[in-house]
Swiss-Prot record:
Pfam families: YbjQ_1. It comes from the Bacteria. Belongs to the UPF0145 family. InterPro entries: UPF0145_dom_sf (IPR035439), UPF0145_YbjQ-like (IPR002765). It comes from Clostridium botulinum (strain Eklund 17B / Type B). This is UPF0145 protein CLL_A2504.
């Protein structure tokens, strides 16, 4: 399946717009990850702990969006946008939303 941020697929003819599809993931961050990330912040450098969590959440949201597109008969998703939001009383949860337009092309 083609998944792209562009509004069209170069060299392809979109025959049908199936509708908007979403993939959402909410991921909690626990104390051990917070502690490891805090050490990284204290000593400088990147937080591999949070980066890994972010990558995993994004990939899951993209896969969920793709699966929803397949369910409605699409073979591509165009105009994809990915949004990130921190949630929870202590900002302890990360929400990743992937959205785009499911299409059928030839």
């Amino acid at each position: 399946m083609i998944i792209t941020t562009t509004p069209s697929i170069e060299g392809k003819n979109i025959l049908e717009y199936k509708g908007v599809v979403f993939g959402e993931v909410i991921s909690g961050v626990n104390f051990i990850k917070d502690f490891a990330a805090g050490l990284s912040n204290f000593f400088g450098g990147r937080s591999n702990t949070y980066e890994g969590e972010l990558i995993e959440a994004r990939e899951k949201a993209m896969k969920e969006m793709e699966n929803r597109a397949i369910q409605i008969g699409a073979n591509a998703v165009v105009g994809v946008d990915i949004d990130y939001e921190v949630l929870g009383a202590d900002n302890g949860m990360l929400m990743v939303t992937a959205s785009g337009t499911a299409v059928y092309y030839e």
